[in-house]
Amino acid sequence: MVKPGDEFRVEYLDWTGGQIKNDDNANDIRDVDLTQVHYLSGPIGVEGAEPGDLMVVDILDVGVLKESEWGFTGLFAKENGGGFLTEHYPEANKACWDFHGIYASSRHIPGVEFAGIMHPGLIGCLPSKELLDEWNEREGGLVATAPDRVPPLATLPSEETAVMGRMKKDEAAAAAKEAARTVPPREHGGNCDIKNLSRGSRVFFPVYVKDGGLSMGDIHFSQGDGEITFCGAIEMAGYLDVRVGLVKGGMKNYNVKNPIFQPSPLE
């Protein structure tokens, strides 16, 4: 639990939880278990946060963990994740990147070196039960329009791999049947993949449950305008330094029903 005005650091695994290795073949990309992503840190409660408030999150710094100064970019196989260009590039592929301060270079893409803008791909607050039910109805209906599509139009709850925290037995089993996957962005924030959400950014998140439940992860060394290959950023383990605050009653007072992002001035 933190208080409004607190500044703190949160460390993160890469989004696959360490499934991808710093080597020269793409078998781990081909065989990655996508029911085990995204790995997030949280939820972090903010004292005094109540449904209807806005949580203000300032991103103060984003960095690389000293024990993991490398990252990766992947092309997922069409049969396991795919991407927006999967019809053109159906086979798995991978590039590993070494970090040198603000620069990245890859032995798999010789002659390329550039400065990255590090940012979290995924950040948001917990949904209410009512909002969770809305998501499952909406996304279940989408999948039902093309149930045999590869890759599927949405990722539905996975009972076998849902992370239930301290919940046990029957309670955990019931929750796993409706636990939201983290692939799409939604009304709470989530997997937004905004490349300029870096140092100097501010985000206003709607609060749907007591204490808010802020979670973050999927850290990128750099990214283009979206992730065309689904794993199209330079994925990494890392840390975020953030400051949190509250706007009491902000959802009603400012008619806010979704996150508001103020991008970083970094380009």
Outline where the language-model segments fall:
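N-terminal, Lys/Arg-enriched amphipathic/low-complexity engagement segments
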Residues: 1-32
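Extended, low-polarity segments enriched in aliphatic/aromatic residues
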Residues: 146-175, 186, 194-198, 202-267
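A generic structural signal for residues embedded in beta-strands
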Residues: 10, 54-57, 205
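Short alpha-helix capping/helix-loop boundary micro-motifs
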Residues: 1, 38-44, 187-192
